[in-house]
């Protein structure tokens, strides 16, 4: 009886979607991990370079990342540059996270160019973020 439960959990775990979170604020990375890991496999990185390296690593193993939550203002590079580099590697869905008031023209250009799906403003409302993640992964 226990074996069938383990198998069911394994199947459920393997069907879990993977979210990569890139933010240079470690407290936010921890918050995202704690909030999201009950529903998703969560990978956290604290720099644009680490983000790109992680995506390359997953791609080399033929493993899929389903969504990237990407901070706009990273310590080493801006999020829009990371988004451009990511799109050269993989057609990954990206939600941009920012505490800054981004110009609507910049946001619209990023969306029209297919670099990001949408922008989520900090401070992040976790329930709204959860809904946005579900919609984005589902392709809505």
Report residues per predicted region.
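Acidic, metal-coordinating helix/loop segments flanking the phosphotransfer/catalytic sites
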Residues: 46-67
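Acidic catalytic/metal-coordinating carboxylates
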Residues: 47, 78-81
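Active-site residues of response regulator receiver
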Residues: 71
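Alpha4 helix (beta4-alpha4-beta5 surface) of REC/receiver domains from two-component response regulators
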Residues: 81, 101-118, 127, 131
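Hydrophobic/aromatic residues positioned on beta-strands within the core alpha/beta folds
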Residues: 97-99
């Amino acid at each position: 009886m226990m074996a069938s439960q383990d198998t069911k959990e394994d199947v459920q775990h393997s069907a879990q979607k993977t979210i990569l979170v890139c933010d240079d604020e470690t407290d936010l990375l921890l918050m995202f991990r704690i909030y999201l890991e009950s529903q998703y496999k969560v990978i956290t990185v604290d720099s644009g370079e680490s983000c790109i390296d992680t995506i390359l690593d997953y791609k080399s193993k033929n493993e899929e990342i389903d969504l990237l939550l990407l901070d706009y203002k990273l310590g080493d590079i801006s999020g829009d540059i990371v988004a451009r580099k990511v799109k050269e590697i993989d057609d990954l869905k990206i939600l941009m996270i920012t505490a800054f008031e981004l110009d609507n023209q910049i946001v619209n250009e990023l969306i029209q160019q297919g670099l990001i799906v949408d922008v989520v403003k900090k401070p992040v409302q976790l329930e709204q973020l959860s809904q946005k993640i579900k919609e984005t992964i589902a392709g809505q």
